[in-house]
């Protein structure tokens, strides 16, 4: 008998060779119907894979990320099976599950192309194959046999992948007449897949290398129920309306120019207003929490990034070194701000009394993203991080972690991100050799993160083995208005850079000690955060943040002078106002400015100019009546002050 322990600490004994499917059935028929994969000692397994020794087991359903991953991974294989039947001789690259669905990179063959118009036929074949409920079979085979199998099919992409694997056992999965190289896990059979939609076709270079062949990437989504697919497609339509690229253009927030370069956004005046207000917002909070603002160059000596290890990590994703007239001197566009902050820390000797030291910077960094990976503001080549690095004593770690969490909570509340969750990434329970830093420091850091979450009442999922080699971390995932998950805000403990840069402080014992370093970026990057904020709010930003709070609309040209006088009076009270004095009918002006998401419209005509008043319309609410200019100004000032005081109160308590 073997002992199976469940997440709640309870356990049961089973015969050796039991499977996740059998365990689910022993608990309840409904669970067996819903379960998609099994977690066995921290690894995700197929449901029919045998468990032969004591294990910690967790059963994953659709609502679990691991369940969706297995479902969508099997859907990618189902698509590949359909493609192989429809396009004999097709070759396969990789076909993973992704955050929302799956894709497969394929090579249809010389002179053959797969277009969007072909997707319905592929979809239909997938549905037919799914209806057969083909069993998905996992096999372990020798590397030589795998090379021979895929070599006989002349599938050079799979042969290349297999050749790079270590000698030993290779895992394949078979369903019907289709076999693929894969680690898994997968569903028990194709019949679980009830609803399928292939979404788009794109190009993708083999292994992300622009010098290699461009393959055809087919994206899809699938669900266990048709109703789920219908809801998802409705969500997609709403997401298209909220696309930050579309709204950013409509609101004149940012743009791109091929003359400047792909992936290098240009912030237009209205977008710059928005971004600067976000930066000022965070600077105010950071000032309260004792941060010091710093500025570092956009470039650094290549040796700096060799010391930090970033050159080895980002070398392939960086722009080429900048050579100077001096022989042997090379500079790099900055891929990260942390090496520069380490150098700032080193400039001045520090005592234990000086710590913690908190250095903050809105620092622009550069990484070369392939053209096919660029996407609006979410994937760019130059972006600004709201970076800060804290240098503290080990005994200060928990307190500093809590304070950073407070900053993130204030930001989420102020910007109406009400639904968020967290993940704590800790070391592997068994394999500890790859981690830098002492056992004592790691235990202290991991305990500090867990206790900080408990003290703040933050529910957090603990993931073992997900920590970076240099320290544990806490990631925040927010749900936007459409229910999509975005990673915003990371707090990372680092024992690596203090070692690499030989950072030290003098302790109470008069000896030299290494500080603990904490990386944190609540926004992540300004570009990506603004993109998420646009899509979350559909461009209807909070009144304190929006670039233009008010627009004045004269009903005809003869009231332009009065409209500009109203705007001047509001401007003098720091209210952000524009005048729309185009020679258009007022109805057209109202419609146009509603599309610009400007919160308040002030309509001025004969009566308003004579009485020194304005007719007020509020975005989404309509007519608010006629007011004196000063009355309206006081109204908008109070609305803004109430918003700002709400989040100021959070950090001043």
UniProtKB/Swiss-Prot annotation:
Gene Ontology molecular function, alphabetical: ATP binding; metal ion binding; threonine-tRNA ligase activity; tRNA binding
GO biological process, one term: threonyl-tRNA aminoacylation
Residues in TGS domain copies: 1-61
Cofactor dependency: Zn(2+)
GO cellular component term of the entry, any: cytoplasm
Stretches for region Catalytic: 243-542
Alphabetical list of PROSITE patterns matching this protein: AA_TRNA_LIGASE_II (PS50862), TGS (PS51880)
One Pfam family in the UniProt entry: tRNA_SAD
Record note on quaternary structure: Homodimer.
PANTHER family: THREONINE--TRNA LIGASE, CHLOROPLASTIC_MITOCHONDRIAL 2, THREONINE-TRNA LIGASE
Protein name, entry field: Threonine--tRNA ligase
Record organism: Porphyromonas gingivalis (strain ATCC BAA-308 / W83)
Primary gene name: thrS
């Amino acid at each position: 008998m073997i002992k199976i322990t469940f997440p709640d600490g309870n356990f049961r004994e089973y015969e050796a060779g039991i499977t996740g499917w059998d365990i689910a059935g022993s608990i309840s028929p409904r669970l067996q119907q819903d379960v998609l994969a099994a977690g066995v000692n921290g690894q995700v397994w197929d449901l029919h894979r045998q468990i032969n020794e004591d294990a910690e087991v967790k059963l994953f359903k659709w609502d679990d990320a691991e369940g969706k991953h297995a479902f969508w991974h099997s859907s990618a294989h189902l698509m590949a099976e359909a493609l192989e039947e429809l396009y004999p001789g097709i070759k396969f690259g990789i076909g993973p599950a992704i955050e929302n669905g799956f894709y497969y990179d394929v090579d249809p063959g010389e002179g053959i192309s797969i277009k969007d118009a072909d997707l319905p036929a592929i979809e239909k074949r997938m549905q037919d194959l799914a209806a057969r409920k083909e069993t998905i079979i996992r096999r372990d085979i020798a590397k030589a046999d795998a090379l021979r199998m895929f070599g006989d099919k002349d599938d050079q992409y799979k042969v290349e992948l297999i050749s790079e694997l270590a000698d030993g056992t290779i895992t394949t999965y078979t369903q019907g007449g289709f076999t693929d190289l894969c680690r898994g896990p997968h569903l028990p059979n194709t019949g679980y897949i009830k609803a399928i939609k292939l979404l788009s076709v794109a190009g993708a270079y083999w292994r992300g290398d622009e010098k290699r062949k461009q393959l055809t990437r087919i994206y899809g989504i699938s669900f266990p129920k048709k109703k789920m697919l219908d809801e998802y497609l409705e969500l997609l339509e709403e997401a298209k309306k909220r696309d930050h690229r579309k709204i950013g253009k409509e609101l004149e927030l940012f743009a791109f120019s091929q003359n400047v370069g792909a992936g290098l956004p240009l912030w237009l005046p209205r977008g710059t207003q928005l971004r600067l207000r976000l930066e000022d917002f965070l600077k105010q909070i950071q000032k309260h929490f004792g941060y010091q603002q710093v500025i570092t160059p956009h470039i650094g000596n290549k040796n700096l990034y060799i010391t930090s290890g970033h050159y080895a990590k980002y070398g392939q994703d960086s722009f080429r070194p900048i050579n100077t007239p001096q022989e042997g001197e090379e500079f790099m566009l900055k891929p990260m701000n942390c090496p520069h902050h380490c150098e700032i820390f080193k400039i001045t000797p520090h005592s234990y009394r000086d710590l913690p030291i908190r250095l903050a910077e809105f620092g622009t960094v550069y990484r070369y993203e392939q053209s096919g990976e660029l996407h609006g503001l979410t994937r760019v080549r130059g972006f600004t991080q709201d970076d800060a690095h804290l240098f503290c004593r080990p005994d200060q770690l928990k307190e500093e972690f809590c304070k950073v969490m407070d900053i993130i909570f204030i930001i989420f509340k102020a910007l109406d991100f009400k639904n968020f969750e967290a993940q704590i990434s800790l070391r592997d329970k068994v394999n500890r050799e790859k981690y830098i830093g002492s056992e004592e420091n790691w235990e202290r850091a991991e305990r500090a993160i867990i206790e900080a979450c408990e003290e703040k009442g933050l529910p957090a999922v603990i993931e073992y083995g997900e920590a970076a080699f240099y320290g544990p971390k806490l990631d925040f995932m927010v749900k936007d208005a459409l229910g999509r998950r975005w990673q915003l805000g990371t707090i990372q403990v680092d024992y690596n850079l203090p070692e690499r840069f030989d950072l030290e402080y003098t302790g109470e014992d008069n000896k030299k000690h290494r500080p603990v370093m904490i990386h944190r970026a609540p926004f992540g990057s300004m570009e990506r955060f603004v993109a998420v904020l646009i899509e979350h709010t559909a461009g209807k930003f909070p009144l304190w943040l929006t670039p233009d709070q008010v627009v004045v609309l004269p009903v005809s040209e003869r009231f332009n002078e009065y409209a500009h006088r109203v705007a001047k009076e509001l401007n003098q009270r720091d209210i952000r106002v524009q005048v729309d004095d185009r020679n258009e009918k007022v109805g057209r002006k109202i419609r146009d400015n509603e599309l610009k998401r400007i919160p308040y419209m002030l309509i001025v005509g004969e009566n308003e100019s004579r009485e020194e008043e304005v007719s007020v319309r509020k975005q989404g609410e309509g007519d608010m009546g006629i007011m004196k200019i000063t009355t309206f100004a006081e109204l908008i000032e109070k609305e803004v002050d109430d918003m700002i005081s709400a989040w100021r109160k959070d950090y001043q308590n």
